[in-house]
UniProtKB/Swiss-Prot annotation:
Organism: Methylobacillus flagellatus (strain ATCC 51484 / DSM 6875 / VKM B-1610 / KT)
Alphabetical keyword list: Acyltransferase, Amino-acid biosynthesis, Cytoplasm, Diaminopimelate biosynthesis, Lysine biosynthesis, Repeat, Transferase
A GO term from the CC aspect: cytoplasm
Protein name per Swiss-Prot or TrEMBL: 2,3,4,5-tetrahydropyridine-2,6-dicarboxylate N-succinyltransferase
The UniProt record lists the keyword tRNA processing: no
GO molecular function terms listed in the Swiss-Prot or TrEMBL record: 2,3,4,5-tetrahydropyridine-2,6-dicarboxylate N-succinyltransferase activity; nucleotidyltransferase activity
Recorded name of the encoding gene: dapD
Pfam families: Hexapep_2, THDPS_N_2
Family membership: Belongs to the transferase hexapeptide repeat family.
Subcellular location: Cytoplasm
Length: 274
């Protein structure tokens, strides 16, 4: 355990007594150091260990939570309107040189909070990226899409218009929502509650997946919870009750594709003839 982690863990146990005026310089320096490293991509709330397995660094989430106890709300002015919050925008002090060095594109009305990371060649349409989130290289966050606190978005992902990727700060032991590399998330879909969508998946428009959502594989009859397997093409559907008197919403895996097929075949073509 690093010295930084030790300071954060100890402070979190005493978080109820911590305020901007009572917190020690050591605690403030540790928390703000973590936020700076999240902002630069040096630290991530969750990291891939191997294959489709991830490890969550809960102490980093604790640092994010502690940051809310260390700062008072202040007046924020973007030149158009004013806000009153504890977390400043990521780009508040960016220069043209900073944006060029970052290598990403930010369209007007995109909002990104400090403590989140945007990788090179990412494109942010008018969207919202919350504190602790990670947006991977070459990813498109489309109009009105939301990337929640600590959510992890992989490389070459397309989050379509109005998509919601849920944030998970509390409970602390919960893992963040994760979207793997090369995924397409269709318009107005929601992936929340720490669900993991593995690499090369296609989620159709209007699919809602939380930890309690049944993810039904129609080829095998298997039901998954909390994780969409690699290469799944998923649409919304229903499963009947045992007595057939009603049905309940589920997500249905209608087919599987590999990365090569995904790269060659258009998304609409994959979703036709299902």
């Amino acid at each position: 355990m690093s010295n930084l982690q030790t300071i954060i863990e100890d402070a979190f146990e005493r978080r109820a007594e911590i305020t901007p005026s009572t917190a020690s310089a050591e605690i403030k320096d540790a928390v703000f150091s973590v936020l700076a490293d999240l902002d630069s991509g040096k630290l991530r709330v969750a990291e891939r260990t191997d294959g489709q397995n991830w490890v969550t660094h809960q102490w980093i989430k604790k640092a994010v939570l502690l940051s809310f106890r260390l700062e008072d709300n202040v007046l924020l002015d973007d030149g158009v309107t004013k806000y009153f919050d504890k977390v400043p925008p990521k780009f508040a002090n960016y220069t043209e040189a900073d944006f060029k060095a970052g290598g990403f594109r930010v369209v007007p009305n995109a909002i990104v909070r400090r403590g989140s990371f945007i990788a090179k060649n990412a494109v942010l349409m008018p969207s919202y990226v919350n504190i602790g989130a990670y947006v991977g290289e070459g990813t498109m966050v489309d109009t009105w899409a939301t990337v929640g606190s600590c959510a992890q978005i992989g490389k070459n992902v397309h989050l379509s218009g109005g998509v919601g990727i849920g944030g998970v700060l509390e409970p602390v032991q919960a893992g963040p929502t994760i979207i793997g590399d090369n995924c397409f998330i269709g318009a107005r879909s929601e992936v929340v509650e720490g669900v993991i969508v593995e690499d090369n998946c296609v989620i159709s428009m209007g699919v809602y997946i939380g930890q309690s959502t049944k993810i039904y594989d129609r080829e095998t009859g298997e039901i998954h919870y909390g994780r969409v397997p690699t290469g799944s093409v998923v649409v919304s559907g229903n499963l009947p009750s045992k007595d057939g008197s009603y049905s309940l919403y589920c997500a249905v895996i209608v087919k599987k594709v590999d990365e090569k097929t995904l790269g060659k075949v258009g998304i609409n073509e994959l979703l036709r003839g299902i």
